[in-house]
A protein has these predicted regions:
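Cell-envelope/glycan interface and biosynthesis
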Residues: 1-129
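Terminus-proximal functional modules
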Residues: 131-133
Length: 134
């Protein structure tokens, strides 16, 4: 429970400090391999999207591999790390930045992006719903 605050931003009514996904500038994603026309398989990343804890850290399996004495387990850790690295490389090449604690979370144009990229300002603020309900 103590780790939850590291991964989910609480609701914040301050338009100057919106949670990243509410700006439309953040995306959670993984990689898949195409097996056949219309058939895909998710690549193993070592944890599910939204996992809480050390498993979610982008370089977690690199560190685990470095400390692992079992060659087979080490290869598994390196495979997970390689998949995470491939995702990061593709997204960074497209101008996104990665959340420091989540292998799956990338941003472009929000406050996280401005902080990690050194941009002076974010491009996007909070998007408020305009959908009316009865």
């Amino acid at each position: 429970v103590a780790d939850v605050g590291r991964f989910w931003a609480p609701p914040n009514p301050d338009p100057a400090a919106p949670p990243p996904h509410s700006t439309g500038a953040a995306v959670d994603l993984t990689l898949a391999r195409r097996l056949d026309m219309g058939v895909h398989e998710l690549l193993e990343m070592g944890s599910e999207i939204d996992a809480i804890g050390a498993l979610s850290e982008p370089d977690h399996f690199s560190l685990r591999a470095a400390a692992c004495a079992d060659p087979q387990q080490r290869q598994t850790f390196l495979r997970f790390h390689g998949h995470r690295q491939a995702l990061r490389e593709v997204m960074v090449a497209a101008g996104f930045v990665q959340h420091p604690n989540e292998w799956w979370h990338f941003s472009w144009g929000d406050q996280l992006w401005a902080w990690r990229s050194g941009a002076p300002l974010a491009h996007y603020g909070r998007i408020d719903s305009t959908v009316e309900t009865d």
